[in-house]
């Protein structure tokens, strides 16, 4: 059994921002076409587990899972999976569903990545640790810590 785990399909340029997290819809479609063209049987994850226990799993079986539940999953991945007739399992980040909010650290990192600003001065808010950030990742980590300290 091969379990293929995906995250999100880009709505815009997210595949450039985090290529390990987002791919283009075309890349996802190409992968599904490859699976179909090669004749790999695609089974749902529950069916795969059941068939493993019963020693009845088809040879070269593939299960497809998608993590996080980004909008691109609904817009691009779900229709492509339906078109190919492939079952899949979606794992939702339930914390963010319950809070009805974005995955803050990823959203913030994307905004910083898209920004053309070279420096951000938060000294008026009493925070100076952004000035010492040596990289974008350090700046995002610092901003997340600031935001988390403001949660009430």
Residue ranges and their predicted role:
Residues 4, 35, 67, 81, ...:
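Conserved, mostly hydrophobic/aromatic
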Residues 76-94:
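A short alpha/beta connector and helix-capping loop motif
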Residues 3, 61-63, 87-89:
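Structural preference for beta-strand elements that scaffold enzyme active sites
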Residues 20-56:
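C-terminal domain-boundary segment and adjacent tail
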Residues 8-12, 48-50, 69-71, 95-98:
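Short, solvent-exposed loop/turn segments at secondary-structure junctions
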Residues 1-21:
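"…centered on the first transmembrane helix and the immediately adjacent amphipathic helix/loop
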Residues 61, 65, 71-77:
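Membrane-embedded segments
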Residues 1, 100-152:
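Extended, charge-rich helix/loop segments that form flexible
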């Amino acid at each position: 059994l091969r379990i293929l785990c995906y995250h999100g399909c880009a709505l815009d340029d997210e595949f450039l921002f985090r290529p390990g997290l987002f791919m283009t819809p075309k890349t996802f479609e190409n992968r599904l076409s490859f699976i179909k063209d090669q004749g790999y049987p695609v089974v749902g994850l529950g069916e795969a587990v059941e068939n493993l226990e019963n020693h009845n799993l088809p040879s070269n079986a593939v299960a497809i899972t998608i993590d996080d539940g980004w909008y691109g999953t609904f817009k691009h991945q779900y229709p492509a999976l339906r078109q190919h007739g492939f079952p899949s399992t979606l794992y939702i980040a339930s914390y963010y569903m319950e809070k009805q909010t974005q995955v803050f650290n990823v959203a913030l990192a994307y905004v910083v990545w898209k920004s053309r600003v070279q420096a951000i001065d938060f000294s008026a808010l009493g925070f100076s640790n952004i000035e010492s950030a040596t990289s974008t990742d350090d700046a995002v980590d610092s901003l997340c810590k600031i935001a988390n300290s403001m949660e009430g």
